Amino acid sequence: IIVERIHLVVFPIFVYMLIRAWSLLRLALIGEGLLVFVAFTWSWWRGADFVFGGTAKGVICGLLTAAVLGAVNFYLLVRAPALPGVPSIRRLYAEVMQPMFGNLSVTEIIVISAVAGIGEELLFRGVLQPELGLFPASVIFGLAHMGGGGTLAFGCWVMVMGGMLGILAIASEGLLAPIIAHAVYDAAAMSYIRWDGNERVA
């Protein structure tokens, strides 16, 4: 427990120092831009094209999935009993994500959410899932969102979200739906942290 708490203190300090040197928006644009570059390079090398699917179907399915993911996330943060893993997710939001996202503007939330949805879905659902399969791609997605002690439960939750986004990509026959679901979910999560998280997450 002590080691876990140390990680949860050291990691936010590192993140805060990084954000002071580079704005979070700039980091997001660079990081997600690299993911897009890797995804398109891999796609070009493999001779495969990205399939985005129908617009109406993608939008509707994406919004519905975002609503489900957002509801589950809110339940974990506010309503769920303190089962194993739940307290660590709540601490991660309070001690890491609140300092990171707590002062974002509406424009920053929209842009960061959009580039995250595009970059991560192109790579994980557009490249890794066709190459490795649904489960391995979802596991890697979860691992990519872990950052030290105390983040295992959060990584498992993100892995589940990755699986749902992967199933959504298959069911909707394209990447548009998971991109929308991912972006809308991220926007809702950051908005919650920005305007309501300080009072609820503990």
Task: Tell me what each language-model feature is.
Residues 2-4:
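Extreme N-terminal basic, low-complexity initiation segments
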Residues 6-11, 27, 41-116, 199-202:
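Juxtamembrane helix-loop-helix connectors linking adjacent transmembrane helices
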Residues 8, 36, 124-125:
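Short amphipathic alpha-helical "recognition" segments used for binding
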Residues 10-11, 38, 131, 188:
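A periodicity- and composition-biased signal for non-globular, repetitive helical segments
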Residues 12-37:
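Cytosolic-side membrane-entry/anchor segment at the start of a transmembrane helix
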Residues 32-38, 65, 185:
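Hydrophobic alpha-helical membrane segments, chiefly transmembrane helices and signal peptide h-regions
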Residues 95-202:
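Transmembrane helix-loop-helix hairpins at the membrane interface
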